[in-house]
Amino acid sequence: MISTAHFTNGLMPIQTGSTLWIGSRKGAIGNGTYGLIDKTGQFVGRHDFDELSWTDSRYIGKRGTALYQLDGKGGEIRLPANASQESSWAKAELEAAREHDISLSFYYPRLNITRVDFCRLAVKLYQKVQPNASAAPAAAFSDCENESVCLAAALGIVTGYDDGTFRPYQSITRQEAAAMLDRLYTTLGDKASAANDKPYADDAQLGDWARSSVYAMREIGIMQGKENNRFRPKDGYTQEQAVVTVERAFQAVK
């Protein structure tokens, strides 16, 4: 099945190769497979999926019982069997975020969060703490008019790229998340000190633009490192990790 019938992120899912159609007054269902085409009408990647959907701000394909995340360039990554399950360590804080209405519903919480969805979370928290916040300004990016993105950019929580784009469906890294969380925390009226008297073992891999934010978020307990005293700045940041850290930010400022 297809859940979208228009171009999203420059791509559109279509059905191909049907040999049998079951018609009705409401439409028809074929027995073909599905794939993505670009705006020139060319297939991008394989087109042998049993189902194809736009889920969690990305295309997810299904072959048999296996699910795949499509990168929009022809590549695909098979999702782990537990992709739709919340991690045990995150359950309590995820539930708290839902209770505080600062969460989003993700089908696959273990997948990396996109820039647009991080903005949606950040704005949810901002509007929770600042209920009289002004409306989103006019779109500031050539490729994105999402209201949460526009407001997050106007507040200084996120920035775009030199070419005027925002790249909303690009995933964020851990150090990018730290920088955005730090700016969000400041926007909410607080400022964390960037104590780094105990640097991470991979401190040299931190971007200069992110270093103070990484340690500031550690200092107030919003975002911690990983095993062996490493931060792993270029690793992806999952959707459930994003919700958990936004919940921690809420606890820190409420």
Where are the language model's segments positioned?
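Conserved "repeat-terminator" motif of extracellular CCP/Sushi domains
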Residues: 7, 13-16, 61-62, 81, ...
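Glutamine-centric residue-chemistry signal
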Residues: 15, 175-176, 241
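Tandem repeat domain/solenoid detector
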Residues: 39, 219-221
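C-terminal/domain-terminus segments
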Residues: 238-245
